Amino acid sequence: MHKRLFITLLGFIILLAGCDYSKEENQTGIFYNVFVKSMDGFLHFLGRVFQDNYGFAIISIVLIVRFILLPFMLIQVKNMHMMREKTKVVQPELDAIRDKMKHATSQEERNAANQLLMKKYQSYGINPLKNMLGCLPVLIQMPILMGLYMSLKYPSSHGITEYPHFLWFDLTQPDLIMTIIAAIMYFVQPLVNSIHYPKDQRKTYYFMMVFSPIFITYASLHSAAALGLYWSISAAFLIVQMHFAHSHYKKVALHEAKKLKQKLEQNKDNSELLTEES
């Protein structure tokens, strides 16, 4: 996962470095028309809604993006806890099947064991494939973030350039304090999230705790403070979202795992009873 994040952010840096929309003749192409121009227009619309307060306009964009990504995040967190807790209950059975796969002497035996494993996953309500949603929120957010970055770096007139002030800083210029806040938030976010994972699965989050603040600091110091504001609010909102999602779905998963354990014990008792009667 940390390799995926690194490649994504590296691609983000390369793409941003290669785009120059300072000249009107360069303001063409699919990316500019679909993302940059659309984001610029949407930012101006929200700016007018908030009476030329573009700080609130950017915060609104954060909330919209986070609510769009919320279902994917909830599915991922729910599946992670369900898979972890249910797997603990049926681990001996799954290990026995994996042992058959390991010691299979033919491809047919391996395929049969693999099919049996998938059937067990399905019967217990465990779906490992849902973990593939992990990178989807990043992929959805990337074009939005790049469009916002470009619309702030090359803004059209009569918008944020005329009303750039928000709180203590200028939204169109780099701001050291906003950069520090954004870096801190992106250190805290993976730190808080890592608490909900076993120690042997926290390496990714330790990597993010180091790499993310470095990337955010570099990008914020070379960008409009509006981008730092976007990152700060987005990270803060994600911290709250993840905390409540993990707390809720951990309880749900523990309850479902308890029901599964009781069901397996009952089936075992019934099987032993039938054996004795026979």
Curated annotation (Swiss-Prot):
Chief site of localization: membrane
Transmembrane segments: 55-75, 132-152, 176-196, 224-244
Hydrolase listed as a keyword: no
Localization of this protein: Cell membrane
Lipid tethering residues (S-diacylglycerol cysteine): C19
GO terms under biological process: protein insertion into membrane; protein transport
Keywords assigned: Cell membrane, Chaperone, Lipoprotein, Membrane, Palmitate, Protein transport, Signal, Transmembrane, Transmembrane helix, Transport
Leader sequence segment: 1-18
Lipidation (N-palmitoyl cysteine): C19
Membrane topology: Multi-pass membrane protein
Domain of life of the native organism: Bacteria
Any one GO molecular-function label of the UniProt entry: membrane insertase activity
Pfam family, one: 60KD_IMP
Function in brief: Required for the insertion and/or proper folding and/or complex formation of integral membrane proteins into the membrane. Involved in integration of membrane proteins that insert both dependently and independently of the Sec translocase complex, as well as at least some lipoproteins.
Family indicated by similarity: Belongs to the OXA1/ALB3/YidC family. Type 2 subfamily.
The protein, known as: Membrane protein insertase YidC 1
Gene: yidC1
